Regions:
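N-terminal leader segment of winged-helix/HTH proteins
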Residues: 1-29
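N-terminal helix-turn-helix DNA-binding core of bacterial DNA-binding proteins
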Residues: 22-64
Length: 142
């Protein structure tokens, strides 16, 4: 049995988190993680939103949100509509192209995670989910 010190375990966990951020997402070349998150928000939570709401929802600066929205608009994944009365106000909507890209990308990611679940098996997958729940609980306490 290998006994690891806390520092060594923390380092392994740090490396693992980096791997998990890269590997399942690697195939998603069309879209960044931030873009994917915003398209997911527009797909599952609200069909229309504004930059301020996205900034608050994702805890990002308004500048970062603006850059991401501009990128999504250039790719024609969202449509930005200015308020007819107050041109400073903008509403953002997901387009059909955006929905297709989101669905395709989500399906690819889920397929990757399905392969992981198959590799781990039911017992280890359930253990992993239990540990992930504890990790979420830990960070939600902060």
């Amino acid at each position: 049995m290998i006994i690891l010190k806390n520092e060594e375990m923390a380092k392994q966990l740090f490396m693992f988190v980096g791997l998990m951020q890269r590997e399942p997402i690697k195939k998603m070349q069309k879209i960044s993680q931030g873009e994917m998150a915003m398209l997911g928000f527009l797909t599952y939570e609200k069909s229309e939103t504004n930059p301020k709401e996205l900034s608050e929802r994702f805890n990002l600066s308004t500048a970062r949100v603006a850059n991401t929205l501009n990128s999504l608009e250039r790719k024609e994944y969202i449509k930005r509509v200015h308020d007819s009365i107050d041109r400073r106000k903008v509403m953002d909507y997901i387009t059909e192209i955006g929905k297709e890209v989101f669905t395709e990308t989500e399906t690819e990611a889920l397929n990757e995670f399905s392969k992981l679940v198959a590799y781990l098996g039911e017992k280890d997958s359930l253990c992993l989910l239990k540990i992930i729940d504890k990790i979420q609980e830990f960070y939600n306490q902060k």
